[in-house]
Amino acid sequence: MSAAPPNGNKIRLATVWLDGCSGCHMSLLDTDERMIAVAQRADVVWGPLVDAKEFPENVDVTLVEGAVSSEDDLERIRRVRNRTRILVSLGDCAITGNVPAMRNKYGVDAVLRRAYLENATLDPKIPLDVIPALLPVSRPVHEVVPVDVFVPGCPPSADLIFSVIGELLEGRIPNPAAKFG
């Protein structure tokens, strides 16, 4: 499996943000001017700030930040996996569930009650009309869909992210056994 398209064109790169803090995307931005070299060989076709309504077809590489915690996350990651050749779990939330999974031992109802009813608020109600339907537990990405590459860290360093992207641009898959460093 290679990230490089067979026709020699630029790779189609996407990033996805599920249930996480955006720290992994901040580390990606911390690659600074090195992203210019990436931009010469990859087109960013999707990301949290891209003004597109639907995740595109035929994506070569997708970096996924965050755990799968809601029905929306589950639907999104399945669609992304179906449209992506190489899926990268970026950061500890995507790899282990990390902070989003801390709620798992309490259950959805207890977490929503604590967050919206028991804390000081002017309007104590659970805003079910605006929050996505939570899954019973928050799960790492690989428990829901197959993952090809794991990039650990909370967040992973900019150097590690750039190294992984560099390997993918060269048509090499970083060793998935390096999941935990």
Each predicted region: which residue ranges?
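Iron-sulfur-associated redox domains of electron-transfer enzymes in respiratory
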Residues: 2-181
